[in-house]
């Protein structure tokens, strides 16, 4: 019986990094097994770096010395001890990292990619949409010219937030500016480019509906988190008056919440995040629930390379896969070079086919990037926006 013999938890980052302030640090767990194999997992930060890191120490107490093949058992054991697991982002994120690393170990022990253990390859290439590409873009021409640079890289889908510094409410002027941006993107890039509208859960219901109705004519692929997350009942009214499909899910932490949203018709495209909703196996369960109600999957993927590799392994197996978020071409070099394995070419992700998650760590670089502290903070710009756009 192979067990987890040692656990190393790394906070990695580059002080002053501004390209993605919500992930200027990343959290990595390294599990070393009794046979010497190494598995990597990742937990998200999003202005929660230190509490998530401490929660990872709690998960370590449950997982260490256990048989990592027993994923269901180990997960349930932590669930038993963690009183607030179902509602604690810190707990679910920490647990997700260990679950992902366990799969990496299992795949390496068996000499096969994780996706082969989840049903095998259904999608050989995964269409990506660009995110993070529009830093410092404020005017329509800024968005269009930057998007054209990414089209040259092969991207055919772009997510962006055109709402600048509007929060809770948005007036006619703010709506007009957003419409001007989306209109320019549609007219300049054409109908064959998909536009994905990011709201970041910033609006109350009435204003979200006004925004959605104003943007319907541009036929977005989806509109993401149009309403404050705690105002979930407003989604019923939103969907009654807006035609664009609704996408959300990165703030939902368990399959039961996803089941409620999809079964009640509050969401069309589910953006679960493997690194805060209990990992790879739970992602498969969530995807199956979503598929049974005719929904599609477009996993949230805004942090680091281990998250991406884990997400792609699930994507490979899904019959209801729609599209995959990608920040890779907006990452700083340190994050891009930390792990190698998967690649993105001509706007599509491709895994390496190597055992486990299919990635290899640059451990020397990892040692150089060890960091202790919170993410970068700018009192004039919330952590969740793309830099230079909240003005």
UniProtKB/Swiss-Prot annotation:
UniProt catalytic activity: D-gluconate = 2-dehydro-3-deoxy-D-gluconate + H2O; D-galactonate = 2-dehydro-3-deoxy-D-galactonate + H2O
Name of the top EC class for this enzyme: lyase
Residue(s) at site: Transition state stabilizer: 325
Pathway note: Carbohydrate acid metabolism; D-gluconate degradation
List of catalytic residues: 200 (proton donor), 300 (proton acceptor)
GO terms, molecular function: galactonate dehydratase activity; gluconate dehydratase activity; metal ion binding
Annotated site location: Increases basicity of active site His: 273
Gene induction: Constitutively expressed.
Cysteines engaged in disulfide bonds, as pairs: none
Highest taxon in the source lineage: Archaea
Enzyme Commission no: 4.2.1.140, 4.2.1.39, 4.2.1.6
SUPFAM superfamilies named in the record: Enolase C-terminal domain-like, Enolase N-terminal domain-like
Activity's thermal dependence: Optimum temperature is 70 degrees Celsius.
Cofactor: Mg(2+)
UniProt-annotated binding residues for Mg(2+): 198, 224, 250
CC cofactor note: Binds 1 Mg(2+) ion per subunit.
Keywords associated with the record: Carbohydrate metabolism, Lyase, Magnesium, Metal-binding
Influence of pH: Optimum pH is between 6.
Quaternary state and interactors: Homooctamer.
Primary role: Involved in the degradation of glucose and galactose via the nonphosphorylative variant of Entner-Doudoroff pathway. Catalyzes the dehydration of gluconate to produce 2-keto-3-deoxygluconate (KDG). It is also able to catalyze the dehydration of galactonate to produce 2-keto-3-deoxygalactonate (KDGal).
Entry's family note: Belongs to the mandelate racemase/muconate lactonizing enzyme family. GaD subfamily.
Protein name: D-gluconate/D-galactonate dehydratase
Species per Swiss-Prot/TrEMBL record: Picrophilus torridus (strain ATCC 700027 / DSM 9790 / JCM 10055 / NBRC 100828 / KAW 2/3)
């Amino acid at each position: 019986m192979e067990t987890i013999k040692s656990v190393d938890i790394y906070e990695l980052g580059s002080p002053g990094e501004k390209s993605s302030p919500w992930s200027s640090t990343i959290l990595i767990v390294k599990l070393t097994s009794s046979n010497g194999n190494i598995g990597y997992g990742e937990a998200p930060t999003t202005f929660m770096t230190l509490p998530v890191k401490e929660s990872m120490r709690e998960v370590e107490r449950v997982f260490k010395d256990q048989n990592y093949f027993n994923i269901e058992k180990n997960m349930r054991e932590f669930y038993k001890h963690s009183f607030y697991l179902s509602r604690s982002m810190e707990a679910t994120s920490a647990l997700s990292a260990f679950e992902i690393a366990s799969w990496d170990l299992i795949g390496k022990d068996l000499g096969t990619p994780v996706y082969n253990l989840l049903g095998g390859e259904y999608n050989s290439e995964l269409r990506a949409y660009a995110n993070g590409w529009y830093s410092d873009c404020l005017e329509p021409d800024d968005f269009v010219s930057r998007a054209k640079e990414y089209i040259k890289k092969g991207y055919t889908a772009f997510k962006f937030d055109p709402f600048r510094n509007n929060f809770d409410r948005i007036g006619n002027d703010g709506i007009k500016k957003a419409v001007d941006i989306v209109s320019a993107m549609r007219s300049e890039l054409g109908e064959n480019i998909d536009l994905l509208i990011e709201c970041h859960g910033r609006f109350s219901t009435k204003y979200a509906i006004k925004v959605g109705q104003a943007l319907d004519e541009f036929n977005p692929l989806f509109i993401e988190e149009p309403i404050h997350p705690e105002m979930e009942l407003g989604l019923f009214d939103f969907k009654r008056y807006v035609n664009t499909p609704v996408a959300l899910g990165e703030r939902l932490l368990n399959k039961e919440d996803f089941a409620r949203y999809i079964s009640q018709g509050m969401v069309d495209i589910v953006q679960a995040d493997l690194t805060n909703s209990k990992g790879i196996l739970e992602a498969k369960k969530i995807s199956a629930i979503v598929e049974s109600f005719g929904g599609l999957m477009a996993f949230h993927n805004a942090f680091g390379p281990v998250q991406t590799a884990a997400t792609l392994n699930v994507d490979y197996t899904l019959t209801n896969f729609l599209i995959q978020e990608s920040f890779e071409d907006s990452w700083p070099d340190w994050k891009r070079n930390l792990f190698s394995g998967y690649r993105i070419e001509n706007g599509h992700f491709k895994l390496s086919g190597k055992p486990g998650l299919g990635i290899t760590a640059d451990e020397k670089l990892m040692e150089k990037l060890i960091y202790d502290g919170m993410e970068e903070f700018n009192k004039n710009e919330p952590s969740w926006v793309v830099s230079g756009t909240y003005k």
